[in-house]
A protein has these predicted regions:
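A conserved short coil-to-beta-strand element within the FAD-binding core of flavoproteins
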Residues: 12, 16-39
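C-terminal, active-site-flanking charged/polar segments
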Residues: 49, 53, 119-120
Length: 209
């Protein structure tokens, strides 16, 4: 296990409103509209952050039965070789699902990249609150455009032809033997510029309600 090296972790953990729940003793039964129901009680939450183990890029999402509009399942949308997202952060048809390191985000210094994605998501949530919106999702056509960019910059990349967790190959998972395009390799700097342009332009690529 990696030690928490950031400042403030233990201080945050020891706050009076923080509880450690042993899910081996009190297994999670289901996710509810208010939070998480274990075998013992329901824990009401404002935000739920998933940590589901390591199965590169899409595995953590596949393990959860994430359903969008009309009962669409995210893992069904992503079962082909080209999962579609917008910036690797949002999907069309799955309102308010803001991802960190989803398919087609940039690759590079991962902790730094996570920080930038979280900044993007926080700014988006702040924008929604200021404008009185309660729901956001990617426009389908914008997700398709982003996928086209991702595929284009990956065409001549040698590493994209090698079976590894970064290309979606996992020998331990049935049906996960095909190479897939799962990352944006146009550069972390360029990715951040694109994300900033989206924010500065008022998030025209997204649909709000």
């Amino acid at each position: 296990r990696r030690l928490p090296l950031e400042s403030g972790y233990f201080e945050a953990y020891n706050r009076p409103n923080v509880r450690l729940i042993d899910v081996l003793e009190n297994p999670i039964e289901r996710i509810t509209p208010k939070g998480v129901q274990t075998t013992v009680e329901e824990h009401e939450l404002d935000i739920l952050v998933y940590a589901t183990g390591f199965d590169g890029v899409t595995g953590g999402y596949d393990l959860i039965d994430i359903q969008g509009l009309g009962g669409r399942r995210l893992k069904d949308d992503w079962k082909d070789d080209l999962p579609k997202t917008f910036l690797g952060v949002l999907n069309d048809g799955f309102p308010n699902l803001l991802m960190v390191l989803g398919p087609h985000t940039s690759r590079g210094n991962i902790p730094r990249h996570i920080e930038k994605i979280v900044d993007f998501n926080v700014a988006l949530i702040r924008h929604m609150r200021e404008q009185g919106y309660s729901r956001v999702e990617a426009r389908s056509e914008e997700a398709a455009k982003w996928l086209a960019q991702v595929v284009e910059v990956n065409k001549n990349r040698l590493a994209g032809k090698i079976p590894s967790w970064q290309t979606g190959v996992n020998a331990n998972v049935p049906g996960r033997q095909n190479i897939r395009v799962l990352g944006y390799y146009g550069g972390a700097t360029r990715y951040r510029e694109i994300a900033e342009q989206v924010a500065d332009g008022g998030y025209k690529e997204l649909m709000f309600r």
